[in-house]
């Protein structure tokens, strides 16, 4: 049997990564490249050059000399460049460096303990079979063994572990299947990473006791080595072993050549190969004798890729070579030079011993006479220097071939292998993940309301180009013959015929006879020897009813691609789209373009017709809200058509019904007229009813619906009605929509019913009759409303609609006049100034607030101003709207538009008729310039609200220039935001999608990742599909009950009941209820033994047992235990029964898809509540319902079961899209500007990035909130607790600082600058209420800490001057040098974390983000510099000082390092105060009792301050009240002068006198809890959970909450953190009024915490993924490729990314199963 070209007969099962060995590459290569010129002078490939024809043709003109094929058939052949000197393999350079660092160069062994090696080896072996728990078991075995035998030998350890390992490996059931799971991969990479990090830095070799050789790497191209000063030789070293460190090298520093590194590595492999082979498992060569060859770390020759993959591009006559070729050419040039140099050195016998002499014949000939001119181009003195230099140059050129970033010094870079793979333009993302497609069209879209909502208008141009391959059969041959005869240019025609053997016949556009001939032979089989299988295939044009996929970019969520049926429009040039679909695509018609794709197989078409069709996409997966809906004109038309008093004559009625039902097949049902005399009239409501009863499918009962319209009942009321007892204004009003059996009886239809809003008419039709019917309803209503506007109504808007009555206008003017005087009052209120304060005083204070560092007061002024002007704008709006308008609704067309939801909002009408109101930028009033003006036309600090952006003008009468300017500022802000936002949210969405792409609901209803690991046992914790749950709310139950007949019929209730038995689930629910009725208080649950012991306790006590306490148990307890054990079975069972736990929820016991009525507990309670309510209602009502109570319950349970999520649903992608898509609507910089009484919170995309992408341990605005217990005692004490937790800075208690500067000359040389600093503190009364502090404490702080800080900062300022250098220098000792290495290492780790925070910026985000990441980088560099300078200058002083210094130096990292002063709170932690809580109860002791106040004591205090630093000359302080102190500082005269006062002020603002670790501020806010009771909540900025635990009697710790997810996870465990993640994401969206279904959030949170720790969705989080291809297609492809190669990873091709890369069908959706055909 012939296999046709496109018949798959083999399938990819997996991909493994590994490295070719040198021998294999030699065999693969067809040519050794030796000629550095790749093209000769004529532009043809030169022999032995990089474009040699043996490597395959470089363009279409040439023929391959290896396989003699042309360009299109030869796939190319590898060549190689032989390197005269060995170089390091750039891929493995970092690992080689670690290996050299962690091994002894003397005895060639690893320096880590033997136990570590054997443990890791066994752990890696058990992980290969997926035995995770064995990893920890092995650690336990080893620890136990080491405790028993303190000094075991390596073989003993091995035996101990080996036994357990072999047992595990042999008893394994899964085979290697278990190894490709996320947890195993994570564990493996963790163990290996830990090994490299922790065990590669021993101080000396444990085997031969030699010290460590220090290896350094420079520029990724050379290794330098410092040998140890002492080497221990073992006596019996055999001659055969490679020598260790030679005598001459001891203590020297030198350059480690690749050759000597290779020798060491080979020796190391002999000793440690058994272990290292496992560590680098990816490099085992199965075909070779030895397992793994260390020569992989080195390159002896370089592979040259085939020419076709680096083509020469031609532009006119010029030729540009490919970047890869340039890189290889640089290597070639070096090779030629090195060969010459080596030949010369061999001639002069100056070769170093590690370089072999050249042996080839050519080189021997060349030894005779060598031109020495080339030496001048090489750097270096002697020949050996020159050799080493060019060797390093060769190394860096080889590096560039792999990765052009590796050479930081080269300016013009050509892409290396890494650059070809990575980023958006790389191979993975551009050519494997996304590919260009055929059979697609793109054009501008324009609106059309006459096609169906599920159609798309296709212009003729596209219709004749897009074709579909249709097999010819006897029943369609007629049609296809006609198509072939019509040819490629006439629609419906065909462009090509594919014959049975796969050959193609193109149909000629001009030759009619050729087409006819082909048409006649469509069914006659082709003549040929073997009988071919199959038939001819005709590529026919698109015709009406074909399905196309439409897509508009950006494709942010599932509805951005939907399937539409084609409708061919002959005269058009553009795609025509129905208005209703705009919202799904987020399209408008201002020039948007869309893409259409034409599926090419019956399978693809079937999926498009049934699943992707527009009718099925009515609800959005984000939160189940409808997307499709009619717009603008249709709203106005529909509302006015269904208003009371709208009548039609017979011909108008028929015309409208016909217009609405143009494509109905069959009879049209009509309604009888509602008015008969004087002549028959039909109402507008009847027209709509006629449509409805004709659209609803024949065999279904029409629907019943009670709902509300968008236009409120109040809007129709012209004047207030007389009060009538029991009158309900909404009953039978136009705002109440009632539909009975498909007839609209009451109410106006507007946006709430056919717009994109939930629970309207269209949504209800979708729920009961399915998507097809709801689509028809939308289509027909659109046609009907359009016709009504065209024929009978028309709609316009004039000036009359916006005019205001004169009376209202006068009122408006008066309020505006009043508003101009509110300024001074607002500033006074904000700054707590007295009423009497003069304007100048107020203005001065305002200026201070504006120019001061702490912007809180200024924000407060802003806030007060906003409150004041809001009041006035509301007043104006009340005066003008709605009764102040000249015309009122419904005559007023503008109001009609706004009320019916067509366009515009009340804000727009107010801006037209009332005033524009307060202009805000980023949430605050327009900022002031430095001069205090907001715009040049105002005075500085002007009080009128107008100057702060309050626009009193309106568009009706025009606005003034400054107001216009403010208005434009607000407009500009919106544009800036949109531009910046896109890249941020786009990258965020990409991160989530790449992580969650594999999560799919399986056939057992679990959600699993692509490697099979269970993320959730039921999707979203109840297994329901979001769009189907919309009517499972108690509010919608009445609708379901009133339409029960339709639902039972459409959902096949009787069939379900005949198959599924609800008894098991119902029985289970009964058991749970029974248990709950017996245990009303679920908190007090006791075990069986406890209940028993309580009962017999008294009896045992009476026995008065006398015996000693054994094992810490009293005799009474032992007696009780004995009695319990001796109790007979029956009595014991009685106790156990009482103590039985509550049965598990039904969902976890009975699978909901198999067992009917197994529903979630919440739903069960909702159904219970509703059925009681319903039963009560039916008793009251006059007519008895046919629906029985049981039937109602069964109906709701059926609806629930039918709402389960289908297997195959890609819930991971839906969750990612549902978080990513709304985040594009969030404005980027929404700050929550804190006034004085509020917390600062990170919002919007920055907060989302913090939670999802970074999962950072130190978040920007950490906070805790705890409700205060509602007891008198607690409410009293919480005030002092708040005071105690608030941190105090020196700046807050300083009144002023006086600085006097003078000059002093003692002798000729000694000139001094003398500063006298006098600090005046605020009186105690000022801060007594707020701060936990006394004047003495401040003074003590100044003396012990502040002056030290001051001297430190002066020293920093003057570091360049030598005088300060001499004060404290300290020699660097050997110990420091040793520590430097350690320090570098720990800093490396820190940098890792830092990087995690700052540098997760992929290409996309960087586009709009250069400034931000630069700033971050700069900040990081500065920080590092800080750390280093700190190391040099640190004094041996108290640790606290460093703490304080660090805090000083890095005020922006305060959150990270608060002064650790819990134990010794300055000023409070004196010896007398035992602990903090005591403060709340004990009265303060007066000061003088603590400190002796004599002259000696004073002298001692002054002396202590003087001793702080030589430059402190004198000190005085206030002995009476402790309200001031004065210090004199005498500095040697410097070259540099600096401003002492600014230095002192800035220090004072940052110096912390008193703080609770981690907490900066405390606030008490009043809120209402769930039960609507008021309660106090304590909010803190900063986090310190253990501190709050001390105050259990004040705070309700059970309800403590914090937004720091790591803190919660560490304190309360991962499940608590999971809930915090959900709540935090929900809160971020809630600020913008965006609802995201909690099921999405729970899935994301579950995924992030899957491994038991909270992991980010970034490249650090994807490290544990079991699919290397998924990692590589995400970010840093090269990194992951190296990793996969080293570990020899295997990709099972299960993840969607991996499937896309190799072209498999993704295992999700319809790809989750396979249809197999019985062949019998």
From Swiss-Prot:
Provide the disulphide bond pattern.
Answer: none
Residues binding DNA nontemplate strand: 429
Q: Which GO terms describe its molecular function?
A: chromatin binding; DNA binding; DNA-directed RNA polymerase activity; DNA/RNA hybrid binding; magnesium ion binding; zinc ion binding
Q: Which cofactor does it need?
A: Mg(2+)
Q: Which GO terms describe its biological process?
A: negative regulation of protein localization to nucleolus; transcription by RNA polymerase I
Annotated region (Disordered), positions in chain: 1365-1498
Q: What is the effect of changing residue 496 to I?
A: In AFDCIN; likely pathogenic
- Report residue spans for region: Involved in RRN3 binding to Pol I complex: 468-542
Give positions of region: Rudder: 403-416
* Stretches for region Mediates the interaction with TOP2A: 1060-1155
**Where does it localize?**
Nucleus, Nucleolus; Chromosome
Cofactor stoichiometry and binding remark: Two Mg(2+) ions are coordinated by both the catalytic residues and the nucleic acid substrate to enhance substrate recognition and catalytic efficiency.
One Pfam entry name:
RNA_pol_Rpb1_3
What InterPro entries does the entry give?
DNA-dir_RNA_pol1_lsu_C, DNA-dir_RNA_pol1_lsu_N, DNA-dir_RpoC_beta_prime, RNA_pol_asu, RNA_pol_N, RNA_pol_Rpb1_1, RNA_pol_Rpb1_3, RNA_pol_Rpb1_3_sf
Biased region (Basic and acidic residues) positions are 1373-1390, 1447-1461
Where is RNA annotated to bind? 552, 592
Query: Which positions in this protein are listed as binding Zn(2+) 2?
Result: 104, 107, 205, 208
Which amino acids does the record list as binding Mg(2+) 1?
588, 590, 592
List the EC numbers from the record: 2.7.7.6
For this protein, what reaction is catalysed?
A: RNA(n) + a ribonucleoside 5'-triphosphate = RNA(n+1) + diphosphate
Annotated phenotype, changing residue 1241 to I: In AFDCIN; likely pathogenic
Domains as described in the record: The clamps form the DNA-binding cleft. The bridging helix crosses the cleft near the catalytic site and is thought to promote polymerase translocation by acting as a ratchet that moves the DNA-RNA hybrid through the active site.
Summarize the disease involvement recorded for this protein: Acrofacial dysostosis, Cincinnati type: A form of acrofacial dysostosis, a group of disorders characterized by malformations of the craniofacial skeleton and, in some patients, the limbs. AFDCIN patients may also have structural cardiac defects and neurologic abnormalities including developmental delay, hypotonia, motor delay and seizures. AFDCIN inheritance is autosomal dominant.
Its recorded name reads: DNA-directed RNA polymerase I subunit RPA1
Q: To which species is this protein native?
A: Homo sapiens (Human)
């Amino acid at each position: 049997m012939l296999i046709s070209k496109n018949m798959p007969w083999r399938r990819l099962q997996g991909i493994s990564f590994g490295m070719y060995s040198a021998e294999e590459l030699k065999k693969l290569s067809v040519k050794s490249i030796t000629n550095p010129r790749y093209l000769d002078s004529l532009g043809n490939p030169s022999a032995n050059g990089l474009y040699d024809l043996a490597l395959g043709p470089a363009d279409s003109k040439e023929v391959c000399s290896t396989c003699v094929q042309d360009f299109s058939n030869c796939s190319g052949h590898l060549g190689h460049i032989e390197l005269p000197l060995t170089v390091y393999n750039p891929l493995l350079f970092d690992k080689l460096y670690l290996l050299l660092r962690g091994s002894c160069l003397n005895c060639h062994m690893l320096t880590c303990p033997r136990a570590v090696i054997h443990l890791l080896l066994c752990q890696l072996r058990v992980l290969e079979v997926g035995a995770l728990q064995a990893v920890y078991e092995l650690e336990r075995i080893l620890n136990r063994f080491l405790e028993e035998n303190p000094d075991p030998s390596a073989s003993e350890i091995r035996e101990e572990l080996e036994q357990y390992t072999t047992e595990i490996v042999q008893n394994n059931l899964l085979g290697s299947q278990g190894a490709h799971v996320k947890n195993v991969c994570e564990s493996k990479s963790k163990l290996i990473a830990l090994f490299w990090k922790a065990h590669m830095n021993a101080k000396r070799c444990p085997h031969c006791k030699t010290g460590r050789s220090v290896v350094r790497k420079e520029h990724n191209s050379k290794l330098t080595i410092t040998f140890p000063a002492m080497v221990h030789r073992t006596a019996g070293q055999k001659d055969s072993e490679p020598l260790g460190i030679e005598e001459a090298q001891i203590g020297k520093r030198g350059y480690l050549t690749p050759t000597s590194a290779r020798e060491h590595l080979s020796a190391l492999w002999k000793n440690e190969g058994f272990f290292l082979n496992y560590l680098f498992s990816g490099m085992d060569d199965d075909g070779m004798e030895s397992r793994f060859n260390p020569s992989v770390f080195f390159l002896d020759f370089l592979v040259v890729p085939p020419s076709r993959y680096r083509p020469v591009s031609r532009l006119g006559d010029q030729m540009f070579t490919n970047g890869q070729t340039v890189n290889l050419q640089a290597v070639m040039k070096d090779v030629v030079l090195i060969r010459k140099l080596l030949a010369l050195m061999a001639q002069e016998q100056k070769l170093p011993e590690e370089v072999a002499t050249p042996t080839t014949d050519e080189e021997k000939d060349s030894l005779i006479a060598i031109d020495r001119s080339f030496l001048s181009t090489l750097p270096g003195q002697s020949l050996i220097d020159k050799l080493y230099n060019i060797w390093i140059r060769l190394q860096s050129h080889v590096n560039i071939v792999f990765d052009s970033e590796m050479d930081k010094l080269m300016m013009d870079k050509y892409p290396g292998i890494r650059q070809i793979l990575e980023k958006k333009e790389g191979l993975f993302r551009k050519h494997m993940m996304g590919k260009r497609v055929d059979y697609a069209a793109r054009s501008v879209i324009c609106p059309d309301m006459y096609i169906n909502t599920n159609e798309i208008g296709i212009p003729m141009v596209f219709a004749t180009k897009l074709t579909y391959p249709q097999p010819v059969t006897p029943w369609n041959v007629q049609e296809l013959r006609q198509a072939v005869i019509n040819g490629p240019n006439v629609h419906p025609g065909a462009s090509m015929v594919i014959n049975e053997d796969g050959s193609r016949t193109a149909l000629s556009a001009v030759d009619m006879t050729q087409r006819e001939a082909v048409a006649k032979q469509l069914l006659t089989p082709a003549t040929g020897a073997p009988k071919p299988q199959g038939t001819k295939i005709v590529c026919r044009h698109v015709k009406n009813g074909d399905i196309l996929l439409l897509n508009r970019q950006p494709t942010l969520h599932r509805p951005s691609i939907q399937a539409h049926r084609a409708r061919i429009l002959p005269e058009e040039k553009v795609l025509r789209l129905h208005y209703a679909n705009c919202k799904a695509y987020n399209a408008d018609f201002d020039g948007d373009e869309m893409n259409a794709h034409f599926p090419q197989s019956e399978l693809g078409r079937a999926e498009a017709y049934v699943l992707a069709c527009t009718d099925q996409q009515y609800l959005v997966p984000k939160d189940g809200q409808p997307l499709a809906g009619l717009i603008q004109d249709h709203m106005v038309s529909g509302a006015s058509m269904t208003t009371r008093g709208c009548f039609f004559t017979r011909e108008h009625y028929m015309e409208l019904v016909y217009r609405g039902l143009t494509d109905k097949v069959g009879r049209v049902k009509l309604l009888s007229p509602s008015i008969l005399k004087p002549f028959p009239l039909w109402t507008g409501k009847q027209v709509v009813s006629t449509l409805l009863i004709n659209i609803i499918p024949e065999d279904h009962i029409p629907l019943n619906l009670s709902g509300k319209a968008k236009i409120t009942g109040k809007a129709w009321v012209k004047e207030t009605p007389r009060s009538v007892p029991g009158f309900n204004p909404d009953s039978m009003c136009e705002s109440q929509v009632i539909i009975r059996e498909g007839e609209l009886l009451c109410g106006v239809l507007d946006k709430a019913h056919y717009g994109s809003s939930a629970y309207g008419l269209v949504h209800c039709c979708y729920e009961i009759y399915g998507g097809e019917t709801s689509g028809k309803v939308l289509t027909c209503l659109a046609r009907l409303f359009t016709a009504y506007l065209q024929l009978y109504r028309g709609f316009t808007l004039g000036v009359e609609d916006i005019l205001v009555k004169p009376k209202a206008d006068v009122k408006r003017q008066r309020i505006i006049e009043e508003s101009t005087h509110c300024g001074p009052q607002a500033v006074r209120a904000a700054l707590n100034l007295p009423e009497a304060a003069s304007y100048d005083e107020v203005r001065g204070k305002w200026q201070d607030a504006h120019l001061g560092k702490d912007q809180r007061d200024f924000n407060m002024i802003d806030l007060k101003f906003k409150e004041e002007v809001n009041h006035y704008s509301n007043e104006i709006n009340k005066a003008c709207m709605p009764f102040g308008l000249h015309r009122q609704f419904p005559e007023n067309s503008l109001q009609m538009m706004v009320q019916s939801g067509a366009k515009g909002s009340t804000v727009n009408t107010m801006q037209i008729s009332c005033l524009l109101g307060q202009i805000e930028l980023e949430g605050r009033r327009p900022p002031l310039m430095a001069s205090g003006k907001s715009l040049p036309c105002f005075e500085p600090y002007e009080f009128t609200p107008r100057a702060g952006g309050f626009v009193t003008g309106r568009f009706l009468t025009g606005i003034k220039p400054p107001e216009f300017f403010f208005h434009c500022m607000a407009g500009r802000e919106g544009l800036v935001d949109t531009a910046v936002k896109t890249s941020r949210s786009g990258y965020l969405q990409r991160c989530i999608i790449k992580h969650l792409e594999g999560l799919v609901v399986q056939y057992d209803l679990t959600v699993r990742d692509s490697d099979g690991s269970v993320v959730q046992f039921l999707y979203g914790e109840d297994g329901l599909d979001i769009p189907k749950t919309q009517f499972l709310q108690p509010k919608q139950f009445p609708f379901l009950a009133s339409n029960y007949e339709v639902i039972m019929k459409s959902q096949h209730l009787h069939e379900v009941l005949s198959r599924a038995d609800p008894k098991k689930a119902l029985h289970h629910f009964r058991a749970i209820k029974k248990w709950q009725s017996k245990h009303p208080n679920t908190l007090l649950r006791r075990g069986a033994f406890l209940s028993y012991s309580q009962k017999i306790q008294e009896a045992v006590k009476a026995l008065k047992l006398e015996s000693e306490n054994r094992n810490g148990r009293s005799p009474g307890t032992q007696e009780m235990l004995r009695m319990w054990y001796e109790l007979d079975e029956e009595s014991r069972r009685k106790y156990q029964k009482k103590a039985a736990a509550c049965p598990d929820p039904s969902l976890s016991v009975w699978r909901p898809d198999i067992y009917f009525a197994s529903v979630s507990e919440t739903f069960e309670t909702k159904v219970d509540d509703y059925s009681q309510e319903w039963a009560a209602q039916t008793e009251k009502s006059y007519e008895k319902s046919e629906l029985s109570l049981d039937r109602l319950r069964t109906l709701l349970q059926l609806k629930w079961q039918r709402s389960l999520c289908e297997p195959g649903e890609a819930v991971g992608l839906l969750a990612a899209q549902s978080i990513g898509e709304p985040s594009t609507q969030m404005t980027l910089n929404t700050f929550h500007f804190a006034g004085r009484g509020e917390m600062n919170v990170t919002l919007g995309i920055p907060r989302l990035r913090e939670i999802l992408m970074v999962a950072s341990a130190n978040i920007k605005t950490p906070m805790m909130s705890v409700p205060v217990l509602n007891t008198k005692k607690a409410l009293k004490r919480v005030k002092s607790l708040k005071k105690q937790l608030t941190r105090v800075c020196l700046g807050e208690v300083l009144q002023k600082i006086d600085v006097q500067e003078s000059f002093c000359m003692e002798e000729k040389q000694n000139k001094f600058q003398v500063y006298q600093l006098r600090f005046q503190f605020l009186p105690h009364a000022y801060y007594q209420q707020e701060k936990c502090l006394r004047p003495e404490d401040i003074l003590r702080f100044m003396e012990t800490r502040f002056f030290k800080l001051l001297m430190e900062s002066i020293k920093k300022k003057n570091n360049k001057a030598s005088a300060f250098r001499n004060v404290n220098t300290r020699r660097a000792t050997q110990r420091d040098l040793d520590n430097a290495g350690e320090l570098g290492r720990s800093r490396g780790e820190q940098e890792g974390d830092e990087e995690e925070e700052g540098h997760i910026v992929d290409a996309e985000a960087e586009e709009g983000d250069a400034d931000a990441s630069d700033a971050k980088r700069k900040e990081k560099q500065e920080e590092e510099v800080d750390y280093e300078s700190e190391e040099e200058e640190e004094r041996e002083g108290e640790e606290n000082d460093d703490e304080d210094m660090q805090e000083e130096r890095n005020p922006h990292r305060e959150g990270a390092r608060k002064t650790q002063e819990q134990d010794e709170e300055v000023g409070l932690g004196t010896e007398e105060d035992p602990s903090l809580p005591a403060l709340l109860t004990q009265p303060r002791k007066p000061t003088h009792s603590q400190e002796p106040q004599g002259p000696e004591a004073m002298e001692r205090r002054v002396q202590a301050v003087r001793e702080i630093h030589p430059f402190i000359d004198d000190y005085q302080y206030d002995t009476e009240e402790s309200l001031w102190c004065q210090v004199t500082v005498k500095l040697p005269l410097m070259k540099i002068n600096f401003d002492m006062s600014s230095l002192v002020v800035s220090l004072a603002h940052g110096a912390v006198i008193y703080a609770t670790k981690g907490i900066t501020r405390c606030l008490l806010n009043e809120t209402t809890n769930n039960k609507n009771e008021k309660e106090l909540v304590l909010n803190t900025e900063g986090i310190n959970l253990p501190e709050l635990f001390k105050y259990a009697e004040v705070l309700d710790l059970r309800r403590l909450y914090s937004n720091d997810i790591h803190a919660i996870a560490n304190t309360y465990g991962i499940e608590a953190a999971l809930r915090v993640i959900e709540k935090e994401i929900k809160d971020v969206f809630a600020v913008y009024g965006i609802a995201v279904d909690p099921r999405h959030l729970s899935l994301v949170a579950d995924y992030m915490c899957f491994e038991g720790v909270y992991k980010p969705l970034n490249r650090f989080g994807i490290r544990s993924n079991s699919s290397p291809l998924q990692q590589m297609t995400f970010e840093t492809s090269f990194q992951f490729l190296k990793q996969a190669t080293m570990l020899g990873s295997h990709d099972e091709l299960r993840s969607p990314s991996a499937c896309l890369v190799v072209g498999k069908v993704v295992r999700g959706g319809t790809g989750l199963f396979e249809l197999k055909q019985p062949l019998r």
